Amino acid sequence: MKAAVLTLAVLFLTGSQARHFWQQDEPPQSPWDRVKDLATVYVDVLKDSGRDYVSQFEGSALGKQLNLKLLDNWDSVTSTFSKLREQLGPVTQEFWDNLEKETEGLRQEMSKDLEEVKAKVQPYLDDFQKKWQEEMELYRQKVEPLRAELQEGARQKLHELQEKLSPLGEEMRDRARAHVDALRTHLAPYSDELRQRLAARLEALKENGGARLAEYHAKATEHLSTLSEKAKPALEDLRQGLLPVLESFKVSFLSALEEYTKKLNTQ
């Protein structure tokens, strides 16, 4: 659990640098870009699936009876939300840029720590990969004669072949487990070192009289306040855009309810 928390903290603090710890061939992508891409995909999926649900409802017996015409207003609603997203895009981009700028120093320090630990750990990872490949090749060599025997033998030899393969599989499992345990033993000190470095960085922030933490908090609060103020016009546009849709829905619903009530009274 501690290792998982440490990993998440490092990924957050180092931003795109931590991502390239393992993936050097991909172009850098800022945290805001990743959040924006995820939000865009989510909204698009929600929009498409929502339209399908509305279409299914209007095609049902109840939907036809109520005749709310939700599908007619769906494009208007999605267009309004798309407009809101476009208006808020630059505002939220500015907020994220400011936040990244304020934490640049801390992220650079953590990135440096991560690179140093990576350099120390890399030989053990390379050695583990080499041994793993050797074990796989050894296993393949041991299994190859049995595979040939299976091709040449009859069905009655299948059980005999399975008995021969079982010890090989157990041996492979035990040897792999030994390599994993050895790798875990080698990496443990460096995991502790990285955790201690992170703790030291955070402790240093506290020991500075809390000045840097207070500064981060104050600037984040300021940026959030600015974001809220700049978002007000866009949210007001959203409210104005939804009013006709809500009013149309209200009229259709009341009309359907009145018609249904009349039918009940005539029965």
UniProtKB/Swiss-Prot annotation:
Q: From which residue to which does the signal peptide run?
A: 1-18
In the UniProt record, does the keyword Glycoprotein occur?
yes
Q: What is known to happen upon mutating residue 28 to R?
A: In Munster-3B
Q: How is it modified after translation?
A: Glycosylated.
Start and end residues of the sequence repeats are: 68-89, 90-111, 112-122, 123-144, 145-166, 167-188, 189-210, 211-232, 233-243, 244-267
Methionine sulfoxide-modified residues are where?
A: 110, 136
User: GO molecular function, one example?
Assistant: identical protein binding
Any Pfam family: Apolipoprotein
- Spans annotated as 10 X approximate tandem repeats: 68-267
Under the cellular component aspect of Gene Ontology, which terms does the record hold?
blood microparticle; chylomicron; collagen-containing extracellular matrix; cytoplasmic vesicle; cytosol; early endosome; endocytic vesicle; endocytic vesicle lumen
How it assembles, according to the record, is: Homodimer. Interacts with NAXE and CLU. Component of a sperm activating protein complex (SPAP), consisting of APOA1, an immunoglobulin heavy chain, an immunoglobulin light chain and albumin. Interacts with NDRG1. Interacts with SCGB3A2. Interacts with NAXE and YJEFN3.
Q: What is this protein called?
A: Apolipoprotein A-I
In which organism is this protein found? Homo sapiens (Human)
